[in-house]
Amino acid sequence: MNRLKEKFQKEITPALMSKFNYKSVMQVPKIEKIVINVGVGDAVQNSKALDNAVEELTQIAGQKPVITRAKKSIAGFRLREGMPIGAKVTLRGEQMYEFFDKLVTVSLPRVRDFRGVSKKSFDGRGNYTLGVKEQLIFPEIDYDKVSKVRGMDIVIVTTANTDEEARELLTQFGMPFQK
């Protein structure tokens, strides 16, 4: 069993039960899924760029991403509907906990001038979105093999009803929020 999952069941659940006065264990918010999205703008001119992004995302997440396509044509960006423009991967269960553990303990501390993640990135429904400026913070990415520095969005979807509950949940999991 994963370290974080065990911590959730043994420590976090009772702590949240007492803090928010839940009547049932099923009311306690939990992390439902983590979605990692990489937008590759250069894929319009250069289809090789997308292959590299997919390869890197596979290494980071540990599973094969799905290629996202343009919903609309935008003439200004020379974009046609249906063109591949990015990749995303949805993690659930064991892999989700593995990735979150790695993100909090290894990757985020490797960010330059890191002072904690923003408290304002909640969406009002208990989900948290985190933007990463470069993929090099992940230990799986080999610095020498990187063709281009790419950012990504990491969305942590929780079952919490309010931002306050979600913030408390992520703080208990060890998410380093700004003071």
UniProtKB/Swiss-Prot annotation:
- RNA-binding as a keyword of this entry, yes or no, is yes
Q: Which InterPro entries match?
A: Ribosomal_uL5 (IPR002132), Ribosomal_uL5_bac-type (IPR020930), Ribosomal_uL5_C (IPR031309), Ribosomal_uL5_CS (IPR020929), Ribosomal_uL5_dom_sf (IPR022803), Ribosomal_uL5_N (IPR031310)
Give GO terms: molecular function aspect only: rRNA binding; structural constituent of ribosome; tRNA binding
Q: Extract the Gene3D superfamilies matched here.
A: 3.30.1440.10
One GO cellular-component annotation of the UniProt record comes to: ribosome
The UniProt entry's GO biological process terms, in alphabetical order, are: translation
Which UniProt key words apply to this protein? Ribonucleoprotein, Ribosomal protein, RNA-binding, rRNA-binding, tRNA-binding
- List all disulphide bridges recorded for this chain: none
Protein function:
This is one of the proteins that bind and probably mediate the attachment of the 5S RNA into the large ribosomal subunit, where it forms part of the central protuberance. In the 70S ribosome it contacts protein S13 of the 30S subunit (bridge B1b), connecting the 2 subunits; this bridge is implicated in subunit movement. Contacts the P site tRNA; the 5S rRNA and some of its associated proteins might help stabilize positioning of ribosome-bound tRNAs.
Question: Can you state the subunit structure given in the record?
Answer: Part of the 50S ribosomal subunit; part of the 5S rRNA/L5/L18/L25 subcomplex. Contacts the 5S rRNA and the P site tRNA. Forms a bridge to the 30S subunit in the 70S ribosome.
UniProt lists the family membership as follows:
Belongs to the universal ribosomal protein uL5 family.
Under the heading PANTHER family, the entry gives: 60S RIBOSOMAL PROTEIN L11-RELATED
What is the name of the protein in this document?
Large ribosomal subunit protein uL5
Q: Which gene encodes it?
A: rplE
